Amino acid sequence: MAHITRFETPWFLVISKKQYKWTVRPNAGPHPIEKSIPLAVVIRDYLKLAETVREAKHIIFDGKVLVDGKVRKDYKYPVGLMDIVSIPSADLYFRVIPDNVRFMRLSKISADEAHYKYVRIMNKTTVKGGSIQLNLEDGRNILVDKETAKSFKTLMTLKIELPSQNIVDSFIISEGSYAIFVGGKNVGIHGVVKNINLSKFKSRKYSVITLESKDGNTYQTNLMNVMSIGREKSDMRVD
């Protein structure tokens, strides 16, 4: 189905449900449909660079829009958390970050910042030849040797260069590190990790993380909803 009614769209999409009956349905891709924004909606409703889907299509089909450093000409391409949306011809660069009100929002960044993406390791697998494949949250994979793989843990965040995928840095959730909630009722809250309560009877992903925001309030959620984005302070722009 190419389109869905606006009333069937995810609650967080920034679109007017009274203006038109139909809107764009995102294609299958690196992010779940229920957690993604169609590229045409990003251009029209989030960035206000077009008034209609047709106008947004022209911008996209002209090859002016990049997602994670690659030109995307699919107007239904699913854009999700931590993706980099770039329009170099207009000197516009954005990172999709968690938001406590609308789940996701586009944060304006510099051209230099747009060269880097933050993405979590969801699991690791051994491939033919003995190399280890790091399977990342946005569907991409990175091959490393066995020795290097030992330093990478599940749910660790990688800072990768775009579009090469070279690993520039990595961040693990630990007490004193900086993190942001990417799921749960407090999505978008960020601050310093104060405590990690490891689950005794369930897998590590159910560990409870306590985070203290810059206003001094504390919040808790399970590890699956937390993304490390720095050591003592955030490595990326979050405000």
Curated annotation (Swiss-Prot):
| Entry's Gene Ontology cellular component terms | cytosolic small ribosomal subunit
GO molecular function per UniProt: rRNA binding; structural constituent of ribosome
- Tell me the ranges covered by the S4 RNA-binding domain, including all copies: 37-99
| Nuclease among keywords | no
Q: Which GO terms describe its biological process?
A: translation
- For this UniProt record, give its keywords in alphabetical order, as a comma-separated list: Ribonucleoprotein, Ribosomal protein, RNA-binding, rRNA-binding
User: Record's SMART domains?
Assistant: S4
Does the entry feature the keyword Signal, yes or no? no
**Family label:** Belongs to the eukaryotic ribosomal protein eS4 family.
Q: What is this protein called?
A: Small ribosomal subunit protein eS4
Query: Which organism does this record belong to?
Result: Saccharolobus islandicus (strain L.S.2.15 / Lassen #1) (Sulfolobus islandicus)
